[in-house]
Each structure stands twice: as C-alpha cells, then as structure tokens.
Amino acid sequence: MNSLQQLSIADTLTTIRPGKIADRPFWNRFARQFIYCPAFEFSKVNGAASYRFHVCDRFGTDHTFTADSPDAPLTPIWAELPVGPVFVVVDAMDASGNTIARVGERTFYRNAPFNACYPPKSCSYADCARKTYEYLFQLDFIQELSKGIVDPDYPLSCYPSKMLSSIINGMVNYAEMNPERKADAMRIARGAADNLIKTAIPAGEPLEFFPLTYSGKVIKSAGGEKTIMMLYPASVGRAMLKLFAASGERHYLDYAIKIGEQYLKLQLPNGTWHLILNQADGLPNAANYCCPTGIMLFLEALAEACGDIRYRTVAKRGVSFFSDLIDSFNWEGQFEDVAAQKTPYQNLSKHIATDIYLYLGKIQPDAPEVRRGAREVQRFSEDPFIVWEQPGWAGSPDAFNERTEESLHTRNWGWLRWHTPCALEQYRCYVPVDASVAKMIRYFLLMYDLEKNPLDLAKARALGDSFTRVQCSNGRIPTWMSPESPLSDDWINCMFASAEALKLLAKYEEQ
C-alpha cells in the first residue's frame, strides 16, 4: 500500500457531521452509499444498557460490535467491510446482554475509497480541453447562433439562460485560446447574448428584463414553464459582463445592470432570494431559498464593471445566509429540471456546498473555520457522489434490490456502463455527469491550494485522467460519462464546464 492509499484509507474512518451533536440533524437519512464511516439516526430504547450492531457484508460475514448509543458510528468495523451492499441491524440490549428490542435497520452500499492506482491519462489536460473546445465550436447548434438563430431541434434549447450563458462564456474563452477563430467565436457569443436580451421579460412586468429560464418545448421544469429560477439571471449577467469585457460593447453591460437592479429589489432580509418566482406576479413559487453564491459573484463583478458599490453591498449580505446552510447541512439540489426539494435532505447534491467554500476559500483562505468547513464539505461531496471504481463483487444488483427497494442500486443503476472515476449529480439524478466531475476537480484543487495535501491533488488528477480516457476521438466529452450515449443527450453547458476544469488542472500538471 503506497502513502496515498494509506492517507485515503485513514481518512475514510472520519464520520462526516454526525447528528445529535449540538442538535444537528442527521444529514444522511436518504443517503444510499458511503465512502466515509457513517452513523445513523436510530433512537434509544428505555431500559437499554447497550446496543448491539450486526453489520452484514456482501459475503454474508456478520461484523459485530457493541456501543453505548444506537447512533454510534460504524468505526469499529468500517475498515473491515468490503465494497458492496451492507445490511445493518441494531438491537437494544439489557444489562445481562439480552435483546429487548430491535432499534432499526439500514441498507446501504459500501463504496470503494480512492486507491491512487487508476489508469493513466491518455493525453495532457490542456490537449483534452483544447479538443473539447474544438468539438463544441463546430456543433450545429452553436454555429447557428452566429446567425442569431437558436436551433429548436437541440432539445436542451428549452433552457435558454443556462445553455446560452454557457455558450457566451465558452466562446469568449475560445476566442482567447484560438486567435484565428476569434471573430467567428465572438460572433457566436454575440448571437447568444442578443437572443437572451431579445427574449427577456418585457419592461413593465414584475420580473422585467430577466432572461427566460424556460422557452419552447420544455422537457422538465422545477416550478412550471412560466417561472424564473433565480440562479440563472445571475449566470446570464456574468456572461454579459464577460462579453462586455471582451468586446467593449456597452449594451451588454447595460443589460447586466438591468438584471442587477432586479436582484437589488428582490433580495430578502435573510440575505438571499427565493429560489423560484412566478413570471406573472413575481411571487415565490416554492418555499425554498437560493444558495446565493452565483448571484453574489455576479453582483460583485457588476460593481467592479460599473463602479456602483450598491451591488457589492447587496452581495455581502448573502454571506449571512451561508451560516444557515452550513449549520443545517441541507445541501439541496437546485436544478431547473428538478422540482424544488420539499423534505429536508431528500435530494442532496454537492454543488451548493462546494460553491460556498469555493467562494469562502478565495476570500478567507487562512480562516480556520473556513478550512475546517471546506474539508468537511470535501468529504461530504465525495462520500455519496464520487464513484472511484466499478463494484468488484460478483453479486447481482437484482438480488440486492430484493432486500429493499430503498437500497442504493435501483433498476437505473447501470454500473457496468459507467466510466470511472466519476461523480454523481444529485439524489434525483443519481448518475455520473461530467459537470459534477468538473466541479470536484475544481474543489479538490481548492483543497490542495489551502492545505497542500497531496491526496487532494491526486484525486483531482484521477478525475481529470478519467476525462481524457472517456473523451471521444472528435473531442466530445459525453455528459453521462459514456461514449455510447446519444449526442442529443449532451448538455453543452456541462461540456464547457469540463473543458474549463481541465484547463485549470493543466496548471497543476507538473506539480
């Protein structure tokens, strides 16, 4: 076992944010797989002197230990458990060691920890990023934007703010990378931006000037087709500022200011914004709040671009909302095509957790509480969302499902088709997504910058290496981390995110 493997195994004995400490809830009540040692929400039984844990692995071996509390972590046996399905039974015992009650049961998947021995990359990270940009540039949907046309045949054109803002950013980046194609790339960026401005909510309406979250034949929506998810106007605003900086064309800054003014009016006393607003009346469609990181970054950039400190003042108020999210650990998935979470912890994702510490890690890198929180979020983000390797057991997923329908491997769990290492998106889309891999590359690099722990850099590289191996010969990085998936299933915004993560990782290639 090499030094990185030793670091990895030792780290997996850490229990992430256990519940019932300082009244914290158990965040993992809906989690279905673990790399790090878990503890579960089992309640005490009157008259119990101790609690006996029976932990059955995929081979049928019963690992047992006794604890004073039914929610004790599985630390005594965690290192012994092989990768595969695990079935936990906890019994309450009296002072004589007799069973007096069944406390609870739990099924989960013991996921493989990072082992530092994966296949090498097939090309440099910089080359992989370049090929991805070349592939994206020639796509029909992107080329049509140079004529001001949004091709409705691309199914995901129904999410204009998300798709077109990513294309603006991507084409400005590509123009910088490839001067020979700068004019063409900038023409595409302008076409995407002009379309967003042209189709924005008209003046005089409650949400005037906001770009549309949904348009055309909508596949799925979080709150209805005539709603605005408040994350996305900020994404568009940041793209407009990037285009203004690259082109000098004032009307893109002017439109970003219009978006910024709406955020100033709509900020709530708690420092954030409602997640979803009805387009017709501007009222909240759901009780959920935004994680405000993206909005704050937009407002800070807007203040820098136009010199108006009001935007920076409003952005600073968002920091106060971070503490609520950090304390609750309710890192809900916030996506335009998934209904807003109604039950806490039911649909977790690593995105808003990592976004917060990517932000705090830049502005307060030496703060001990930021470093502690960032490490805790790294473990959380890896625990239920990274798959370092395919399961190596000979069991049947169908047999595993027979044990409980709430187990990890549902009928949709297609592990034999997954190209690993990979990262899963959210509980409600519990499959590999390249943008999730990209986010974790960026996050592991943040952790490496903060602490210089070689394990973080090794994990970032392992994920980047996976990109180089899954990339198709034409430069495509499949959204679902499977070259067999149809081209029409690719999310362009995700591929741009992957290319940018690879460009960042290339800066660490020789370290």
Predicted regions and their residues:
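Extracellular fibronectin type III
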Residues: A95-P113
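Surface-exposed, short loops/turns at beta-strand junctions within beta-sandwich domains
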Residues: I77-P85
